[in-house]
């Protein structure tokens, strides 16, 4: 308690000294009164400044621009020298009152004084070291100065058109133009432009600055011991009233952005989404700040606006809409790219076609037709070429006689081949014993069934067949088997060779027959040598005169050689062991062959 009382006494002494120096500074009486009023309005006492001193300062600076400059210089020196948070905060409260209720020249003077490096609203390094519990107060002083600086910058930039032609709360701004005399005699009133008539880019700029200003206001929420200090509460009252208008401006801009959201491009839609996300967090903090202010009795509860919070559901809907729109835009771009590529291909094709098309004027006329003599010579040459080609084609041999187009000869060959299969003399005459020849069925008969029966009854010489499919032709062939064997034995070229017990032909050194069991080829009379021979004419006799292919002869020779080797082995076994009954014969049969053909 002693230290605090001592510090208060020292502060009171400093205030009295400052008042005395202000009275004897040698300047005019009005300037001396201004300095004394500023010192009394910013005393070291932890009580709000008296209203009469603030009104005196406002009245003294309303006459001339020079008084405004002197007031700003005095306030700057006061902030630069003091290390007490009470003096600094009271000075900032006075500046806020002068900016809000004083002349418009205060804004310009304080703005340029701060930008020139004068310590007026730049309190970022301020710290009260006189007390141990002054940290919360020092922090509030720094944040309060930042809010005032941001507010002043916002208004100045709005007035000079660097942030658009608008102002907070729709107030009428006056643009001052300094003349040669540098007085306040000239002023132009610039009316604010309605937000609904602004362009989207201007709306984005405005709401970004409003959000920055709202962040500065939210940072002014006191903490610790500063929450219950009277000077701090008095300093909060004017800025809380200003925050109401900031909130209304932000909500108005949000409504306009929602109306334009469906028509915006994807980049602008993303900006709107980011703005809404930031505003959502700011409104939550603002609601909490207003609740504390209501509890502390700062302004009336009816003056506070109802905070319309932005729910997460609304943000999700906006995000989903942006995603769908971007996906649709992407598909359109891909289709447009494909269509452009197709158009380029079509243009290239048309260019190629145009290049390929010949100019009709560049086409030359055909020459005159040649004389008729040349036309007559050409057909003769073509006829000669055709004759030569036909001769070359006829020179090729047709072994199977398939190229013969004579229908009569082909039919006779087929009939002779079919009749050769029957056993009996071939009769060429129509009145032979074999009956009438085959006749084609006539289609012009009206009653085809009757004609078919009559034709069947006229067939003569039909041979009956025995039951079970036994053919008489087979029976006659069995009776003639002996005659065929006799003819084969008597044949010199096709006789058999080898011993009587041999199973292979040609084993006795004589050549084997080309066809083993066929009779000798017939003569011109139809039989082999003897006309009265019972052996009929062989229809395949002509093929006996042609030697078989080489691979057929090789295969036949291998078979004969293998059979000869088997026969020799059996005879050797028989001569060595003799007859030993069935067992020995069975062993001989089970003995594997010692000869293996090699190909």
UniProtKB/Swiss-Prot annotation:
One of its GO terms (molecular function) is clathrin binding. Residues 332-382, 580-599 are annotated as: Disordered. GO terms for biological process: clathrin coat assembly; clathrin-dependent endocytosis; pollen tube growth; protein localization to plasma membrane. Residues 26-162 form the ENTH domain. SUPFAM superfamilies: ENTH/VHS domain, GAT-like domain. InterPro entries: ANTH_dom, ANTH_dom_sf, ANTH_N_plant, AP180-like, ENTH, ENTH_VHS. Pfam families: ANTH. Residues 585-599 have a biased composition (Polar residues). Residues 341-359, 373-382 have a biased composition (Acidic residues). It is found in: Membrane, Clathrin-coated pit; Golgi apparatus; Cytoplasmic vesicle, Clathrin-coated vesicle. Keywords: Coated pit, Cytoplasmic vesicle, Endocytosis, Golgi apparatus, Membrane. GO terms for cellular component: clathrin-coated pit; clathrin-coated vesicle; Golgi apparatus; pollen tube; pollen tube tip. This is Putative clathrin assembly protein At1g03050.
